[in-house]
């Protein structure tokens, strides 16, 4: 008998706020999910990337293989998602809508929600996460700190992991380390040796680090 397989299904949902825009996404689902943890993935810079970014897809598939329901989606103005890009000003409303859609998936466990952002997506996730109590942990990949030169309006106090490239040209480690050190709550940094900002060619080590962190988080009671 063939082993159960992961399913990948396109979905449409709406951003929060007014006007509300229809957004497109892909849900990765493990076989027969029951109280499955949920991950929502935010892709890099909309001008040059989308939800089909190699690292984003690999993370979603690997998390589904690990038993999570994973949703990756296109920000407004990207692909078939309606609206216009706003360079991070309104994209947090897209993430809010994506979380709503992800938690409505059959078998989803609303008490175990992880948000993962890559580059621009990490910036959007950092902006939004402190305002949504449903988010239990946050993973930021290649966070572009230059976008928040004056800091973030609020900070996420729950567990968080920062995955960074050894040679990140937009957010070097010497800038990321003091930023993370000053954040409240549990936090950690994972350096992907040899990688640059977008992790091209280093997706494997990045995915491995993220899946390991998520598995540990899933098994933490009350987190």
Regions found by a protein language model. Give the residues of each.
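Short beta-strand/loop motif that positions the catalytic acidic residue
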Residues: 156-157, 162-164, 168
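Acidic catalytic loop of the alpha/beta-hydrolase fold
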Residues: 166-171, 197-198
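N-terminal cap/lid segment of alpha/beta-hydrolase-fold proteins
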Residues: 1-37
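Gly/Ala-rich beta-loop-alpha elbow adjacent to hydrolase catalytic centers
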Residues: 117-125
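Catalytic histidine-centered segment of alpha/beta-hydrolase-like enzymes
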Residues: 83, 195-207
């Amino acid at each position: 008998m063939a082993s159960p397989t992961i399913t990948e299904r396109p979905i449409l949902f709406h951003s929060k706020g007014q006007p509300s825009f229809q957004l497109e996404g892909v849900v990765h689902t493990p076989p027969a999910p029951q109280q499955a943890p949920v991950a929502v993935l935010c892709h890099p810079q909309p001008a040059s990337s989308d939800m089909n970014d190699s690292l984003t897809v690999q993370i979603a598939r690997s998390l589904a293989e690990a038993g999570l329901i994973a949703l990756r989606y296109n920000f407004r103005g990207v692909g078939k998602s309606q609206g216009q890009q706003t360079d991070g000003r309104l994209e947090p409303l897209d993430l809010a809508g994506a979380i709503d859609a992800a938690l409505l998936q059959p078998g989803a466990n609303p008490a175990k929600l992880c948000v993962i952002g890559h580059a621009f997506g990490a910036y959007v996730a950092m902006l939004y996460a402190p305002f949504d109590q449903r988010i239990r942990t946050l993973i930021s990949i290649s966070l572009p700190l230059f976008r928040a030169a004056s800091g973030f309006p609020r900070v996420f106090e729950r567990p968080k992991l920062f995955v960074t490239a050894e040679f990140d040209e937009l957010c070097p480690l010497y800038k990321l380390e003091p930023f993370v050190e000053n954040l409240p709550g549990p936090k950690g940094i994972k350096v992907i040796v040899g990688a640059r900002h977008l992790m091209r060619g280093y997706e494997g080590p990045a995915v491995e680090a993220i899946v390991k962190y998520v598995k540990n988080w899933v098994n933490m009671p009350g987190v």
